[in-house]
Amino acid sequence: MRIAIGCDHIVTDEKMAVSEFLKSKGYEVIDFGTYDHTRTHYPIFGKKVGEAVTSGQADLGVCICGTGVGINNAVNKVPGVRSALVRDMTTALYAKEQLNANVIGFGGKITGELLMCDIIEAFIHAEYKPTEENKKLIAKIEHVESHNAQQTDANFFTEFLEKWDRGEYHD
């Protein structure tokens, strides 16, 4: 199984721990970064993980930022992604079994590394349990997806990053 993983600079260490755990379990990890603590932007990495999952490059995705809120919102903008922000086993299993989630999101400063690893392992092994009700619900979710043609452009964030480098944006 191939698992895409991405994070922002705040949780690089946590992502690396999760990545090493997954590799130790025999999973192929596709790490989209970030790889250090240099200030960066979670939408970039959420988008990369989402695209890897929806293209078939990865089977599942894991996104981590400080609270999980930002990167999870970003990855959910990729058409075909159903990501759940979780911090407990029950929510993760519901997301996979009932909503057929293909990405799982965490707040790396909210949920500890060991718990994230346990939850991810359970998420991987859980199976979607299709029912007429949840199939209809998933279809409704897919119906509200926004298809922004520009987001498939490999340079989608280039202008933003150039402005950032010039100091035109700040937190």
Curated annotation (Swiss-Prot):
EC number: 5.3.1.26
Known pathway: Carbohydrate metabolism; D-galactose 6-phosphate degradation; D-tagatose 6-phosphate from D-galactose 6-phosphate: step 1/1
Keywords, in A-Z order: Isomerase, Lactose metabolism
Gene3D superfamilies (alphabetical): Sugar-phosphate isomerase, RpiB/LacA/LacB
GO molecular function, one term: galactose-6-phosphate isomerase activity
NCBIfam families: lacB (TIGR01119), PRK05571.1 (NF004051), PRK08622.1 (NF006381), PRK12615.1 (NF009258), rpiB_lacA_lacB (TIGR00689)
Similarity field: Belongs to the LacAB/RpiB family.
Name of the featured protein: Galactose-6-phosphate isomerase subunit LacB
Annotated organism of origin: Streptococcus pneumoniae serotype 4 (strain ATCC BAA-334 / TIGR4)
